Amino acid sequence: MSRIESLTRARIDRSRELASKTREKEKMKEAKDARYTNGHLFTTISVSGMTMCYACNKSITAKEALICPTCNVTIHNRCKDTLANCTKVKQKQQKAALLKNNTALQSVSLRSKTTIRERPSSAIYPSDSFRQSLLGSRRGRSSLSLAKSVSTTNIAGHFNDESPLGLRRILSQSTDSLNMRNRTLSVESLIDEAEVIYSELMSDFEMDEKDFAADSWSLAVDSSFLQQHKKEVMKQQDVIYELIQTELHHVRTLKIMTRLFRTGMLEELHLEPGVVQGLFPCVDELSDIHTRFLSQLLERRRQALCPGSTRNFVIHRLGDLLISQFSGPSAEQMCKTYSEFCSRHSKALKLYKELYARDKRFQQFIRKVTRPAVLKRHGVQECILLVTQRITKYPLLISRILQHSHGIEEERQDLTTALGLVKELLSNVDEGIYQLEKGARLQEIYNRMDPRAQTPVPGKGPFGREELLRRKLIHDGCLLWKTATGRFKDVLVLLMTDVLVFLQEKDQKYIFPTLDKPSVVSLQNLIVRDIANQEKGMFLISAAPPEMYEVHTASRDDRSTWIRVIQQSVRTCPSREDFPLIETEDEAYLRRIKMELQQKDRALVELLREKVGLFAEMTHFQAEEDGGSGMALPTLPRGLFRSESLESPRGERLLQDAIREVEGLKDLLVGPGVELLLTPREPALPLEPDSGGNTSPGVTANGEARTFNGSIELCRADSDSSQRDRNGNQLRSPQEEALQRLVNLYGLLHGLQAAVAQQDTLMEARFPEGPERREKLCRANSRDGEAGRAGAAPVAPEKQATELALLQRQHALLQEELRRCRRLGEERATEAGSLEARLRESEQARALLEREAEEARRQLAALGQTEPLPAEAPWARRPVDPRRRSLPAGDALYLSFNPPQPSRGTDRLDLPVTTRSVHRNFEDRERQELGSPEERLQDSSDPDTGSEEEGSSRLSPPHSPRDFTRMQDIPEETESRDGEAVASES
């Protein structure tokens, strides 16, 4: 029985093992079948975050990534059922079916007596009607899209394995041709549509693109024309050709961004305008700037074309165009637009990648637009990068043009000036990018701050997050702040215009740390020092309030950077008069008004500059109409209306230049020997008729008559227009000289008007700050005039009149300041008089108290003579006069009087009576009159006084300390009534 049981038990165990193995095999098979979907053999892999799913075009994480090693398709785990059949497996199945079909056909031909051609087609292929019913109409097939292609397995899946092989082959060939035809038509339609859009886009520059299709100028012109020029000219023209060609390509890139991408996103995809603006910031402004510049370059090329040729040209002058492009309003507009575009470059690329990853329609649009070969290298990312890099190409091109320019010195000077302007523009763009990035960072920090976060500033009030937006962010970073307990706190330090701000992150929001030291440190007189024994630590020593902060950086280089930027900010820190630490609402309102005034001044200066330019054009046009053809346009003095710069002309210098121009114009019109007798107070002089009956307003030194309109002199000078100087250069004609001086005079007078307007605004803005500030301002404004007078020649009468007017203006300002000082002195005198009156009242009260004290002493002496009191009696030390306890003593009243201290910055008040001397005299007098306590006790031992007091009130000494304490607690009114009774009895 034991053997049977053991065999049975072994059989049962073996059956269990076989069952478990079978279950494991089934599970493995199910897992394998689960991965084997539509011919794909998927395996799990680990991918990066930027890998896209082939089915849904979304990013794949590491946990749900599957890959088919046969066709190299990477998809989500959830997208494997939506994927089409594996292409490699499909090709293998088609090959196997084709080979099997061929072998079957061969076997059939061997068994049959007739050939395949002789047999009916129905023996191998189905009938046409059956084929038509299976395949469906062509109209239904044409509706199939490229994305949803039909597979052979789906169509032939209704037939069993016994179906004819020819039928399956026909179905496979028909569906493959259908998919291929639809795919070809779709791609061709997309390419045609994109090419049509691009051709319409570049229709404006079609001829120009043909002219600049060659790689260089040497290949664009004729060979015979090329051989006529030297090697340096060829190199120069090659660089100029490259400048125009690259500018044309840049304009094409901007047109693609505006008309192709942006218009399509707005009209076809219906994206939000804010999203599209984030992708292409400032493209309209950039397109206008470079289109205008390209038009000027192409016009210069057309002017340089050789007669009878459309290809051969040599451009000799280009510096004037470059100067006009990279200076003035054009340079300011370029600086502003490129700064904004480049600062938002990274955000635009990030936004584009997000849209491309999550929006399938956006992907299809980008693929459709970039189908043509021309646009394959001009995607959205490539266009943004090309626009960013364009401004850096100008210095290289201009320097190469300057390197190969020899012969025309004026052209070299213009090119040198243009190169300097371009480099200055690049530095301004870099600074603008830095400021915009820091502004965006400051706005980000402001948005993350707790709205209720405030920190107290000693003597200033609470410092809130609104104060951050008033300032500019210079540098920021995370540091370690060592507290008084020796612990380190992670803080975000903001280096701003005039302060250092410490912030701490709490619950994903920034707050001011609540530590033992203020969180806002002023940069005024701030000292920064590195810690000697540590590579990452530094001390920040503040003057107001006196505190020392110990902070640590992440590395030694970071510490050096922090020390450098803090020291630079301390040197450029504004004063508290110009930039208060905490601004109230009234101060903010006044600051906004001042800013508006400055904007109005700038607008006025710009209008005056345009007015002077229009006047120059008008005078030039009138001179050409009068017969002065070929006359050059008068030039305006550069920098005339740049009143905000340090090198700007002051009002006095402008006035002197205007007077000098008037003198030159007078010498040109009436001759150097004529003195103008007209004065500002005499508008005109009577004209004296000469012998011929003509009037002559002026007479020369030798008595020769001249006219003021200059017709005689100018006509005479026109006949001698071929005059030359000592170097043989052609001199300007008197008419051109008069025109130039007239334009200069007009511009100088309007520049003087602009300078006076700005100076008045500045003076009114600085008026509440006191006379010292205004005196410094007036001194700074007149510094240029004083420097000009120091090295000037003897002053002319007109200049003396000008100086007299300026002195009168200054005298009026001084008189106004004197009246203000007098009013202030009167106010202070009134205040001193009130203080003297209060002092006299206190002296009178003191004298009254002294008289009362003297009377009380006499009464006490009289009482002491009547009835002496024992010296050890406690009530003998009671004050003599009860009223003295209810009234303030003279010295206490005097010491309690605190006169108001003079305010800071004002003069001290010299009072006629010295407090210390009066107090000292009063103490000496009281000491002499009252004497020592022993003398007072001796004086009080008068038997008469004691008898009177005994007869009136019959007081007895206390029998215990409790009675003595109770006697001391007698109210003041009772004591005063007793004192009055005693006084009445006495």
Swiss-Prot record:
GO cellular component term, pick one: cytosol
Record's function text: Activates Rho-GTPases by promoting the exchange of GDP for GTP. May be involved in epithelial barrier permeability, cell motility and polarization, dendritic spine morphology, antigen presentation, leukemic cell differentiation, cell cycle regulation, innate immune response, and cancer. Binds Rac-GTPases, but does not seem to promote nucleotide exchange activity toward Rac-GTPases, which was uniquely reported in PubMed:9857026. May stimulate instead the cortical activity of Rac. Inactive toward CDC42, TC10, or Ras-GTPases.
N6-acetyllysine PTM sites in chain numbering: K353
Annotated DH domain residues: 235-432
Biased composition (Acidic residues): 941-950
Region (Disordered): 683-705, 862-986
PH domain segment(s): 472-571
Subcellular location field: Cytoplasm, Cytoskeleton; Cytoplasm; Cell junction, Tight junction; Golgi apparatus
SUPFAM superfamilies: Cysteine-rich domain (SSF57889), DBL homology domain (DH-domain) (SSF48065), PH domain-like (SSF50729)
Stretch list, region Interaction with DYNLT1: 131-161
Alphabetical UniProt keywords: Acetylation, Cell cycle, Cell division, Cell junction, Cell membrane, Cell projection, Coiled coil, Cytoplasm, Cytoplasmic vesicle, Cytoskeleton, Developmental protein, Differentiation, Golgi apparatus, Guanine-nucleotide releasing factor, Immunity, Innate immunity, Intellectual disability, Membrane, Metal-binding, Microtubule, Mitosis, Neurogenesis, Phosphoprotein, Tight junction, Zinc, Zinc-finger
Record note on domains: The DH (DBL-homology) domain interacts with and promotes loading of GTP on RhoA. Promotes tyrosine phosphorylation of RIPK2. The PH domain has no affinity for phosphoinositides suggesting that it does not interact directly with membranes.
Effect after changing S886D: Increases activity. Abolishes nucleotide exchange activity
Protein name: Rho guanine nucleotide exchange factor 2
